[in-house]
Structure formats: C-alpha cells, structure tokens
Amino acid sequence: MTAALGPVWLRSGPVTLRPWTDADAPVVLAALHDPEIVLWNGSAVPDIAAAEAWVRRRADWSEGDHASFAISATAGLALLGSVSLHEIDPVQGDAEIGYWVAAQARGHGLAARAVTLVCRWAFAVLPVDRIELAHAVENAASGRVAERAGFTLEGRLRRSYRYGDGVKHDELLWSRLRGDGGSSTGVCGTRA
C-alpha cells in the first residue's frame, strides 16, 4: 500500500483523467453491459446500485493500493472510459494497469493516451519502477494500446486468466519501466 494517495486530475491535450463521481454510474452501467468490455474485463454490473458501488470503489483511494481514473474528453468531461493502476506494491516497486473504453469512443487513441498519462504520473509520484499490462492474446486492440503506450512485450502466459466468457485464455504480458519512453513532462496533475 502507498500512504496518502488521493484522487488527482491528469490532462494531456484532448484527454482528461479525472476522479470518479456519482454521476458516472449510469454510463458505467451501460458500458459494463457492452459485450466487448464484459468479455475482456469481467462480468457486467447488474443494476444501477451495483454501478454506483463500482464507482465508489474506484473513487476511494484510501487503501493506497490503487489509483483509478475516469477517462474523459477535456472538452465537456463526459465519461468515455476507465483506467486504473492497481496492485500497487511499494515494497516490490510495481503495479498493474487496466482500462476500458466505451464503444462510441473507441478507435481514437484514448486508451493509449490514458495509459501513458497514468504511467508518467505513477513514475513521477509513486514508489514504482515497473508497471505491467496483461491481456488475452485474442484482444489485439489491447496489444496496440500497450505498444503505443511504450510497453515492451515480455512473453506469453499460458491459460493464465479466466475472462468474461468463462474460458482461461493465454495472455500477453507487457511491462513499462521507469525511464522507458520519456519523462513525466506533459502531465498536469492537481488534487481533486
């Protein structure tokens, strides 16, 4: 766990990563029923109460083991996706990253930009030197995100994770190390 971790705003060009709010729950409910998101990110939330609980868990950084952001367009701040740094381990100096983008916002580079922003922020302010990204081999879009966000492919994990279809898929494991792909420039962070 990392002490004194609190929600921040991160901005880069057209993308803003912001703290979660209760107003995000209806969009989360719709997004987490998208078959693509359910397949690669787990089960759907059944109702608005579950979506509200999902948002509250991501908004609460008090345990210091995760940092979760709502992905939005800088103009308007409407919710377009999610990016989370989780399993933050300051002893080992590593963390994992995950994300999803709503169907209407896919194909515009939002996920890669969001992942890059979170990595730069994490390396600038957290005691982590390594961030891992894993995705099912069949999820080619996540491979493109990893490449664009400066991650290095490390290998294949055989039958390593049970995805939303109930099947254990092989995964590709990527990492980004402190010092890979530039510095923390271009990240504007402010406390929520």
List where the protein language model places each region.
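Conserved beta-strand edge residues that scaffold enzyme active sites
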Residues: 46, 69, 136-137, 160
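GNAT-family acyltransferases
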Residues: 1-104, 167-192
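Conserved active-site tyrosine of GNAT-family acetyltransferases
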Residues: 146, 151, 174
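Glycine-centered small-residue hotspots that permit tight backbone geometry or close packing
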Residues: 65-68, 98, 109, 114, ...
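Conserved catalytic-core motifs of GNAT/GCN5-like acyltransferases
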Residues: 20, 132-134, 152-169
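Conserved acetyl-CoA-binding loop-helix of GNAT-fold acetyltransferases
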Residues: 99-101, 107-121, 140-148
